[in-house]
Regions:
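Non-DNA-binding regulatory cores of transcription-related proteins
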Residues: 87-154, 160
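Helix-rich terminal scaffold detector
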Residues: 1-79
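Interdomain regulatory linker/hinge segments that flank or connect interaction modules
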Residues: 80-87
Length: 160
């Protein structure tokens, strides 16, 4: 009875710990230099976590602890492999990938964001993805231009 229970538990745990892959964006994997460095760091951290999990003696716990790092290794390895590093813009005439743009909204709020790759985007830290609606409406525009979609108007105040 105990052997059958152990085998059943192991098989059940194994199937539970095979996590589905993280979704990969269909968009080109554009990144800044810092974005590539961050992806490489996250890949290294996932590998270290996986290696630490492999040192656990109990097989079911080892599988549980290795599941997330293994999924992250697959994701970050693919993101590093497909990364297209875009150099910082050489001009502040128009909004481009890597630009920091300050704009005002119709309600008077003034916001500043840097336009970066999808994996680097963190609106709370001041960066948005180049595929976000706000970034799409600003790319290619100049100071004084109005971008936006629908009822959302954004006037560009500065580009750095």
């Amino acid at each position: 009875l105990s052997v059958a229970f152990t085998k059943e538990e192991s098989a059940e745990t194994a199937s539970e710990t095979l996590l589905p892959d993280r979704p990969i964006s269909p968009h080109p994997n554009l990144v800044t230099e810092a974005g590539l460095t961050s992806l490489e760091l996250r890949l290294r951290e996932a590998r270290e976590a996986y290696e630490a999990a492999q040192r656990i003696d109990e097989i079911n716990e080892r599988r549980r602890q290795a599941a997330v790092p293994l999924r992250d290794i697959r994701y970050f390895a693919e993101r590093v492999r497909t990364a297209q590093v875009i150099p910082d813009p050489t001009s502040t005439d128009t909004v481009a990938f890597g630009s920091t743009v300050t704009f005002s909204r119709a309600d008077g709020r003034v916001q500043t964001y840097r336009i970066v790759g999808e994996d680097e985007a963190d609106p709370k830290a001041g960066s948005i993805s180049f595929v976000s609606p706000v970034a799409k409406s600003l790319l290619g525009k100049s100071v004084g231009d109005v971008g936006g979609s629908g009822t959302q108007e954004l006037e560009i105040i500065s580009i750095a």
